Structure formats: structure tokens, C-alpha cells
Amino acid sequence: MAKQDYYESLGVAKSADDREIKKAYKRLAMKYHPDRNPGDSEAEAKFKEIKEAYEILIDSQKRAAYDQYGHAAFEQGGMGGGGGGGFGGGGADFGDIFGDVFGDIFGGGRRQRASRGSDLRYNMELSLEEAVRGVTKEIRIPALEECDVCHGNGAKPGSSPITCPTCHGNGQVQMRQGFFTVQQACPHCHGRGKIIKDPCIKCHGHGRVEKSKTLSVKIPAGVDTGDRIRLSGEGEAGDHGAPSGDLYVQVQVKAHPIFQREENNLYCEVPINFAMAALGGEIEVPTLDGRVKLKVPAETQTGKLFRMRGKGVKSVRGGAQGDLLCRVVVETPVNLNERQRQLLQELDESFGGPSGERNSPRSKNFFDGVKKFFDDLTR
């Protein structure tokens, strides 16, 4: 079976310089490397093909021989003197190539820095009143805190971490894997470049200890479910003196027995009897600041909304305060005595029945529509 042209294998022109060849090889090697394609025989074969092509074309002597003789230059006896066949010596510096390309795959590349502490989350449940007015609450959270004996460096007081003798402070070591060399985090110091010979007796060299701490959290007025408050530096302590993480307080507002909130407006339902709805009058309605009087005009229908401006929620981000919207619900009277029943019957008769035109225009329109509907069906 004929071999693929080396230039075609790398997808470069025959005039490509070393920089273009190296760039093409890095891109293809990353794509087809066996560690990224486990169990894929086609990817493995492609990887071997591009590796062979790269080894020939990056070496000026081998490239010149290939340009003149093609693949025959590297077949058994096909080239004298300095050729060498297959994957023979010289050519690519795989330690250099794969140190760049596969550093992340094999865990190497750079010295590992002490990691920042983890962020923490605390779920805080508030009443509607607390959310609207704002409140200060104390919370207690478990967290990893900086050790107060070694002050986070993990070493026994009076001593200090020493340079790792395995990686000599680099935090990484070179490992030979097949035809190339890769860099990995030093297994002795775990990539830090230093080791603790005399660990702190309290934190055992970790630089952090488990503690519970109490914090005072100020909740601003106007917060709502889903809002998040960030307390910088109040998360877990960082690794060996690295910065601490943050604490995020997640707000959840409990359901209220009277009010419902939509953005900065409050809604409530206010029941009124049918006499009040028909004749009008004045009622007391609740607000978060106490009761206020509301005038109900005569002939008010159930479901009508009354807006009380400025009685809603103050925006946590500034701006105008929301409103309170009261929806009146006309109640049907129950538990009637004989006198009340008699009066209602007299009232009904005075209306002229359920479809009385003057007193119940919507009822008349409804019954007129029903009559027309059935008339149309019988035509």
C-alpha cells in the first residue's frame, strides 16, 4: 500500500518553513493523540502517520533526501550514509514539542501555584417584611480557616518549607513516554516546588483547619428570592497562604399569608360584601406599614384593582418605590336568616329577575347572547 505524501499528511505546502510544519504538527498531534482518542485505531494510525511525517520534514537533511528520492530514501538500502530509516535517531525534539502541546494532558507544564480557597454558599430564608425593610442577621458557617499557629504556611513555627530535592523547586519533572518526553507535576511536592520537613502540629502541614465562624450579614432593603449577597474573603482559606474564597448568601423569601410580590409591587385580595360593592363605602386594607383606608366607589365589580402608590417595595437597586394593588372580591352572603332571605327576594324581584336590563347590564348582554346562539342553531 502506497504511503501518504508527508506534506499531505501534515497539510502543508512543499515550500512550508519549519515554523509552519511545527504549527501544523502541533494542531494535528493534539487532535489525534491516543490519550484523547482511547480505543480509536484510526486515530492512532493517523497519529503515527503525522509523527513520522513531522520527524522527516523537520530535519533538514532528511527533508532534502525525501524531496529528492521520496519514500525510497528511507527504505532498507535505499539511502546510503547518513539516512537512517523509519523512526531512527535525530530529527524532532519531542521533549520540546510535547512539553508545549501535552502539558495539560499529562498534568505538567507549569509550576503549580497555591490554590485560592473555595467559595461557600449559605441559603438564607427571610420573611417578606425582612426582605422589604432590610435586616441584619448573624449566621454560623463551617469552613476551612487559616491555621493560627503556622499562619497558613503549614510549617512548624521556627521552621520554613524547603526546596523540593526531586524537582529542585521547579514543581515539575520530565518523564520519558515512548518517543517523547513530557512534563508532569512533581510527585514529591505535588507541583509546589517546596516541601514541609517539619509540619505544624495543629494543621499537620495543610495550613488550614476546620472551624465554625459567626458572621453578621447586612441584608439591604428590597431584596427578593434569587438575589445573592457576596461577602469577599469570607469563604474557605486558601491553600498555604493563598487568598481566601468568598461567601455567597442566597436569598429565599417565604410566602406571605396576605401579600404576593411581583418585582417591586405588592398584591392582595380584599373581600367586600355585595352591599358595599353596590352602594360604595370605605374599608380598611392592610399594608406593610399598617392599615390604611380605601374608598370603594358605588357599583364596584368583583376583581377591580385599586392602586395605592408608594405602598409597595423600595427597589434594592434604587429608583421609585413600588405600589400596592388591592383586588376586591365581592362575597356572596351565607348563613342567611329568614328576614335577610325575604329582603333579598324582594330585591331580586325589583331587579326584574337575573337578566334585569337596568341593574345588571352584563347579565342582560349574556342572556341576550345565549338566546341568539340557540336561535341561530334552530334556523
Swiss-Prot record:
Top-level taxon: Bacteria
Zinc finger feature spans (CR-type): 134-212
Cofactor descriptive note: Binds 2 Zn(2+) ions per monomer.
Cystines in this chain: none
Main localization (coarse): cytoplasm
Chain residues that bind Zn(2+) 1: 147, 150, 200, 203
Subcellular location: Cytoplasm
Cited SMART domains: DnaJ (SM00271)
Cofactor(s) named in the record: Zn(2+)
Swiss-Prot/TrEMBL keywords: Chaperone, Cytoplasm, DNA replication, Metal-binding, Repeat, Stress response, Zinc, Zinc-finger
Domain spans labelled J: 5-70
Database matches in InterPro entries: DnaJ, DnaJ_C, DnaJ_domain, DnaJ_domain_CS, HSP40/DnaJ_pept-bd, HSP_DnaJ_Cys-rich_dom, HSP_DnaJ_Cys-rich_dom_sf, J_dom_sf
Single Gene Ontology MF annotation: heat shock protein binding
Record-listed Zn(2+) 2 binding positions: 164, 167, 186, 189
Cellular component terms per the entry's GO annotation: cytoplasm
Pfam families (UniProt xref): DnaJ, DnaJ_C, DnaJ_CXXCXGXG
Domain notes: The J domain is necessary and sufficient to stimulate DnaK ATPase activity. Zinc center 1 plays an important role in the autonomous, DnaK-independent chaperone activity of DnaJ. Zinc center 2 is essential for interaction with DnaK and for DnaJ activity.
Protein family per UniProt: Belongs to the DnaJ family.
Xref: PANTHER family: CHAPERONE PROTEIN DNAJ, DNAJ HOMOLOG 1, MITOCHONDRIAL-RELATED
Assembly information from the UniProt record: Homodimer.
Free-text function comment from the UniProt entry: Participates actively in the response to hyperosmotic and heat shock by preventing the aggregation of stress-denatured proteins and by disaggregating proteins, also in an autonomous, DnaK-independent fashion. Unfolded proteins bind initially to DnaJ; upon interaction with the DnaJ-bound protein, DnaK hydrolyzes its bound ATP, resulting in the formation of a stable complex. GrpE releases ADP from DnaK; ATP binding to DnaK triggers the release of the substrate protein, thus completing the reaction cycle.
HAMAP family with a match to the protein in the record: DnaJ
The name this protein goes by in its record: Chaperone protein DnaJ
Organism encoding this protein: Pectobacterium atrosepticum (strain SCRI 1043 / ATCC BAA-672) (Erwinia carotovora subsp. atroseptica)
